[in-house]
Swiss-Prot record:
Subcellular location: Cell membrane
Record-annotated membrane-spanning stretches: 336-356, 366-386, 404-424, 442-462, 489-509, 541-561, 563-583
Disulphide bond pairs: C198-C283, C199-C212, C246-C298
Family from the record: Belongs to the G-protein coupled receptor 2 family. Mth subfamily.
Stretches with biased composition (Low complexity): 631-646
Residue segments, region Disordered: 609-658
Gene3D superfamilies in the record: Methuselah ectodomain, domain 2 (2.170.180.11), Rhodopsin 7-helix transmembrane proteins (1.20.1070.10)
Ranges annotated as biased composition (Polar residues): 609-621
Source species of the chain: Drosophila melanogaster (Fruit fly)
Protein name (Swiss-Prot/TrEMBL): Probable G-protein coupled receptor Mth-like 1
Keywords annotated in UniProt: Cell membrane, Disulfide bond, G-protein coupled receptor, Glycoprotein, Membrane, Receptor, Signal, Transducer, Transmembrane, Transmembrane helix
Predominant place of localization: membrane
Amino acid sequence: MDRSRSSRAASSNQFIRPCGLLTTVILLQTLVSMSLAIEEMSPPPAAPPRPSPPPTVKLNKCCHSGEYLNDGTCIAGSEALWLPMVYLVQQQRFFEPHGASPRFLKFLPNTRPTCRKDQTTEIFRSRGANVMLFPNGTLYVRERALMVQPSDYCVDWEVAVVCLNDSQPINALEDPDYAANPLVQQEPPKASLRLSKCCGKWGSYNTQLQNCDLQPNHQAAVDGLLRLSPQLPEGSYQTSYGLPDCGQPGGYSIAGDWQDAKLDRNTAMLQLPHKNLSAGQYCLEHTQREGEVKIIACQHLFSSAAGAGIHDGSIGGTIEQANGQNLQKAVLTGGILVSIVFLSATLVAGFLLPAVHHALHWRCQICYVTCLLFGKILLAIEELSSSLQPGSAACHTLAITMQFFFLAAFFWLNTMCFNIWWTFRDFRPSSLERNQEALRRYLYSLYAWGGPLLITFVAACVDQLPETTLLRPGFGQLYCWFDNRNLSIFAYFYGPIGLLLCANIALFVSTTHQLTCGLWKRDDVKSSSEKSALGRVCLKLVVVMGVTWIADILSWLVGGPHGVWFFTDLINALQGVFIFIVVGCQPQVWTACRRIFCPRLRHDITNTTNGVQHSSSSQGLPSMAGGTEITQNTTTTTTTTNTTATHMPSNPAEDEVPEKAPIAPVAPIVKMETIC
């Protein structure tokens, strides 16, 4: 019975469940249909009321209709859209089109404010929203962060004439306490020096985003003023607000650090390394780093600035000075291009002599010329390319790559100078085994490639750190080079190069001393022709060891007008020409060229050269070692063969030096070649 009772209960439950679900669905459908019917019968909600137009406000126009204000004088002719920008507070937008007048603004023509005795008249430019109007007629001057009543100003095309009180109220838009207590007064300093803060009263410059950060900055959160101590004590200057009026497209750039600049307190002119900025051409701004202040200026002022070793002149010069600077820049750029051609020819000349490719000095020479060639090419691209913009990835990459190749060139130059000095250090016979020469080659490569790579890697890593007290190189910020800060460019470029050049000069002095005081006094060198040839060797060493590069370091350290260093800059720009004269203008090179381009002469040249001189040492390199054939195996055995064929000397100095009787090879015989 229990089992039958339970079975009946289960069957009844199975029947009740679907019936209950069906009933629920029917009820829901009924409720939905009733709610839709009610919504259709109810009237639509009322639209929000349109904001009532503001009351009519009368403002002063400085000149008559159809006239505009220019240097305090009304001149016929005006623009249709002449009004400063009007900000509609309720709609939170500017009235469009910009320059047009809303209907609620009425203007009294040819009406200027009457300033009281305790007021001064000042004219403000309205470009870049420096001046804007509010619907109640209040004028906001962003440059001074102040509000002006309609009776104290007049407006015209791109200008506003304002009567300024001795003490102006704090900006109501930017100071939250002003709304609660509008009687708060801001006492400006009495100093006449006025410096502009770029990003407004409470903003700062974000170096990562490369724009203004309008969030309150901890350095300006107190009063929104510039903090320029210890260079300028507080109270010795006034703070205005806004970016400079460029007048040309192109935006703004970081011109440098405030700590590296010199300020003329009388004129507010700012002197940067090789650049002067007048008071209206720059502004200052704090960054997120404690104590750091950047100088921001119009980018077009630096569009012609140079990269490594080439400096721009002052902006505030005459037209003749500007033309002279442009001419000097064009000449130097042309010198760089000419140097590129001759450096390429030098590489070709070096590869025309496969017999000397094993020489260690030849390898150092080729690496030096190659690095200098690539550095010059990148510098020419930076000078001539108009598509490279500071801040771009291409500009950043170009700056890092150019630093590496220039550093590598000077490291290889130092290696080559050491190799020259090592060869001439005591004029004693020295022979290197093949494994010893290979070891020196590996050590040279490790030093000359590893040093620049390490310096460039450290500079690139420091430049990408978000927060650090280390010196940032600032690649690609202002130029496609360093950001023109003295300490950073010294630490990562001029400092290492200066040390290498000092070492090169010491090696040059030691080498020339060995040539003049050592070889000159030997019995081998007595005639005046031999001594003059030896003097030409020393002259070539000046080019080889990069002695003239020291002038580029001095021009950076001393500074001054660009014309003072024009001659030395031109010599360094044409360095490739001088290197080609020393290396490419060798008789062996011309002989190789004739052998390649004149096949009929190959047989004659081979016959004549086979009967002249044979040496057990490696063939000398027509290198930059002052025209001297530098070999590592200097112990030689020389035999002379008389030939009836045309004499083709392997050493052109033999045409100058009188023939001598053979002497015992106690010391190496230094063969000198004449300059081209």
